[in-house]
Regions:
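Hydrophobic transmembrane alpha-helices
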Residues: 161, 165, 178, 182, ...
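Juxtamembrane helix-entry segments on the extracytoplasmic side of multipass membrane proteins
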Residues: 148-159, 224-238
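Residue-level signature of the transmembrane alpha-helical core
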Residues: 120, 124, 128, 159, ...
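Acidic helix/loop microenvironments that form the catalytic cleft of cell-wall polysaccharide enzymes
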Residues: 201-202, 267-271
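Small-residue-rich segments of transmembrane alpha-helices in multi-pass membrane proteins
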Residues: 119, 184-191, 270-274
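Hydrophobic alpha-helical segments and helix pairs
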Residues: 137-172, 176
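N-terminal, membrane-interfacial amphipathic/helix-forming hydrophobic leader that caps
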Residues: 1-117, 128, 132-135, 139-144, ...
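Membrane-interface helix/loop boundary segments of multi-pass membrane proteins
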Residues: 168-218, 252-259
Length: 324
């Protein structure tokens, strides 16, 4: 590991990162260390992703020009930007874990789960069924209407996204991010912090065709344009609060089970249900703050998320002995 990278991430580790709750004077220092490392990690990930996006885009164009990977020809720069950020996140993950003293999943508060299939399926059903039932009621009351033509290919992409995105995001946010902050023994602050980060990161999405001409600074331009959606404070607030609550539910599921399988199932279910419903039905106008552009934004979806949370906790308490 280079000296520069060590200098960027390095914060001196105390002999023990577990803090006696009775010692308030020594409590905040480890928490700040892990929070600072995590903040540096996310900032570096986004910045390096912005720098890598242009050469990654040019490489894709070079390959398609030679008849290789023709599907890349239909991908705009923003798609390459998101892949570059993901690549940077993976590349910086190992130094983050090493500098945080993590040598195994035990250090992140994760334990083997022999019932992982049950938790994965339960999570998927707990998030999918209430959301789709809500969507069915919207159609019945003519708030939404069925599309005349259903793009089954698009639904296939939603299925693929729910399978791929949910484990990736859960590993980063609830696995690594929450795991590092839980090492401070300050559980509630750890959950709130990672849920806020989870919500904020989802706003790092520039409008399509932001960079029609790609230059070396196009990635940084995409980062800057991500803040353009802040112009609509009601939509911003509705989306942030909903994502924050979803983050709380996912973090709670992870803490209660000491495993990522239940939150992965929940996450995959929300992606699938919201995405598939939007491909099957549509509505003409927004009705903020009650309903947003999809089933995951607004006060009503927030209530559905709360219902899922309540059902999940009761299932862990009564239907999954030993979990709660």
């Amino acid at each position: 590991m280079s000296h520069a990278l060590r200098a960027f991430f390095h914060v001196d580790l105390s002999p023990s990162i577990y803090v006696d709750s009775a010692s308030q004077g020594n409590f905040t220092l480890p928490a700040l260390k892990h929070a600072a490392r995590l903040a540096a990690y996310f900032a570096a990930t986004i910045f390096i992703g912005g720098l890598l996006a242009p050469p990654l885009f040019w490489a894709g164009q070079w390959l398609t020009a030679r008849g290789l990977f023709p599907f890349l020809a239909n991908s705009d720069f923003e798609r390459f930007f998101h892949r570059a950020v993901l690549f940077a996140a993976v590349a910086l993950l190992w130094p983050l874990l090493r500098l945080s003293g993590v040598r195994s999943t035990d250090d992140l508060g994760l334990a083997p789960n022999s019932l992982w299939r049950r938790d994965l399926l339960a999570g998927f059903l707990l998030s999918t069924i209430p959301l789709l039932c809500c969507g069915a009621l919207f159609i019945a009351f003519h708030i939404y209407s069925l599309r005349h033509v259903i793009a089954w290919t698009a639904i296939g992409k939603i299925v693929a996204a729910s399978i791929a995105v949910s484990p990736i995001e859960e590993i980063f946010f609830r696995g690594v991010g929450l795991g590092l902050l839980l090492k401070t023994s300050y559980q509630y602050l750890a959950i709130l912090t990672t849920s806020a980060i989870f919500s904020i990161v989802h706003f790092l999405k520039a409008p399509e065709h932001t960079s029609t001409i790609v230059t070396w600074t196009s990635g940084l331009n995409s980062i800057a344009h991500s803040f353009s959606q802040f112009a609509d404070p009601i939509l911003l607030g509705s989306a942030f609060i909903t994502l924050f609550v979803l983050g709380l539910i996912l973090a709670d599921a992870r803490v209660l089970t000491c495993s990522l399988w239940l939150p992965i199932g929940l996450h995959a279910g929300w992606i699938f249900a919201a995405g598939a419903f939007n491909r099957v039905a549509h509505r003409g106008i927004l009705d903020l703050p009650w309903l947003g552009p999809n089933l995951l934004v607004g006060i009503v979806p927030l209530g559905i998320a709360g219902l899922t949370w309540l059902i999940m906790r009761n299932w862990l308490k009564y239907g999954a002995p030993g979990k709660l």
